[in-house]
């Protein structure tokens, strides 16, 4: 799967751009503020319905316009597919796939799986468990068609349970919701656990290439003691949950633990090593997607030269090429990427003040 055409209209400082990317490595270069990262952001927005740089989607709309429009043609094994997205400053979003209106943004994610390696994406290890849960759930969503419905139900029931706790409801009033919570939690947890087990098999080899001297152990924690029955735990923790006004334990507390010996990876590894570990996780996730459902991710790699030294840039780019996936990588100077590749980029784009030029 690859993008063979991308139209960007009124996205940040890009007034209008049309790209015909290669299915291999696409190098986008230009000075800071030129708009090169905005191209990656537009692709991500088209696949996720949101930005990886700002939580306020209205901010990505060009200041002089009331809406942005993104359009892409995807090359798929079954033939070409067309995706269109329009976001209005009012917050309304319109999405079409092959001319049909789409109501759920999850359909976009299913159609256009995207992996991001940016300065922001390194928060996967540097911040709390939320981003690591999102990492697991991205894979679980793509690997098992039952995951999304179960995950939506977990969120729905958890919201209802927390509202009852804030209302000081008796446990008898909460019991029905607990039965539902347990049922959907078991589904979500089983799929998450199975996914992390599969990821681990691929991850060992990739981590070995990036960090050959380091033994990293990866494990999934479900959000409560695995030796404890979840239904019994909810009942026994009811007084504590009532006091805090929210559910203390459960799938919303799940995490991906990475350890080196007895220490968390965050404490045992240097910042540079942690960045390589995040790269390994993203590449393993993309490779597993291909293995499980025979679909490539699209990799968006932003500002690589500032994040990794020349040796590790070369290693990461080799791994990306080996995936066989489509890659978009940005840099200020093209030589920083070209010199790290064994063969020239399949296509190069220069961006200046929001204008995109193909370099032949």
From Swiss-Prot:
A GO biological process held by the record: double-strand break repair
Molecular function (Gene Ontology), one example: ATP binding
Family: Belongs to the RecF family.
Organism: Shewanella sp. (strain MR-7)
Residue numbers binding ATP: 30-37
Compartments where located: Cytoplasm
Major subcellular location class: cytoplasm
A single Gene Ontology CC term: cytoplasm
Name of the protein in question: DNA replication and repair protein RecF
Record carries keyword Disulfide bond: no
Keyword Nucleotide-binding (UniProt): yes
NCBIfam families reported for this sequence: recf
Keywords: ATP-binding, Cytoplasm, DNA damage, DNA repair, DNA replication, DNA-binding, Nucleotide-binding, SOS response
PROSITE patterns: RECF_1, RECF_2
Function description: The RecF protein is involved in DNA metabolism; it is required for DNA replication and normal SOS inducibility. RecF binds preferentially to single-stranded, linear DNA. It also seems to bind ATP.
Species classification: Bacteria, Pseudomonadati, Pseudomonadota, Gammaproteobacteria, Alteromonadales
Pfam families in the cross-refs: SMC_N (PF02463)
Record-linked HAMAP family: RecF (MF_00365)
């Amino acid at each position: 799967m690859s993008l063979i055409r991308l139209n960007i209209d009124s996205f940040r400082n890009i007034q209008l751009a049309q790209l015909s990317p290669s299915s291999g490595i696409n190098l986008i270069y230009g000075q800071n503020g030129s708009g090169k990262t905005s191209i990656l952001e537009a692709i991500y927005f088209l696949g996720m319905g949101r930005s990886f740089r700002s939580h306020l989607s209205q901010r990505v709309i060009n200041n002089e316009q009331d809406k942005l429009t993104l359009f892409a043609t995807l090359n798929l094994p079954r033939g070409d597919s067309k995706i269109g997205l329009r976001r209005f400053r009012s917050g309304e979003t319109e999405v079409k796939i092959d001319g049909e209106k789409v109501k759920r943004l999850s359909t976009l994610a299913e159609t256009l799986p995207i992996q991001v390696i940016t300065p922001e994406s390194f928060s996967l290890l540097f911040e709390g468990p939320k981003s690591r849960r999102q990492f697991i759930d991205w894979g679980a969503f793509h690997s098992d068609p039952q995951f999304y419905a179960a995950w939506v139900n977990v969120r729905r029931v958890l919201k209802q349970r927390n509202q009852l706790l804030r209302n000081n409801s008796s446990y008898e009033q909460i019991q029905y919701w607990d039965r539902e919570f347990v049922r959907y939690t078991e589904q979500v947890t089983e799929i998450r656990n199975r996914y992390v087990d599969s990821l681990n098999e691929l991850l060992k080899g990739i981590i070995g290439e990036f960090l050959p001297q380091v033994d990293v152990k990866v494990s999934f924690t479900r959000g409560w003691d695995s030796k404890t029955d979840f239904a019994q735990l909810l009942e026994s923790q009811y007084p504590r949950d009532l006091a805090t006004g929210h559910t203390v334990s459960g799938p919303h507390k799940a995490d991906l633990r990475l350890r080196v010996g007895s220490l968390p990876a965050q404490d045992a590894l240097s910042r540079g090593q942690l960045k390589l570990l995040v790269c390994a996780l993203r590449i393993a996730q993309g490779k597993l997607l291909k293995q499980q459902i025979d679909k490539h991710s699209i990799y968006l790699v932003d500002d690589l030269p500032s994040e990794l030294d020349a040796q590790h840039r070369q290693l990461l780019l080799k791994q990306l090429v080996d995936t066989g996936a489509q890659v978009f990588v940005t840099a200020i100077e093209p030589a920083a990427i070209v010199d790290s590749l064994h063969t020239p980029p399949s296509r190069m784009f220069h961006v200046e003040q929001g204008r995109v030029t193909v370099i032949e």
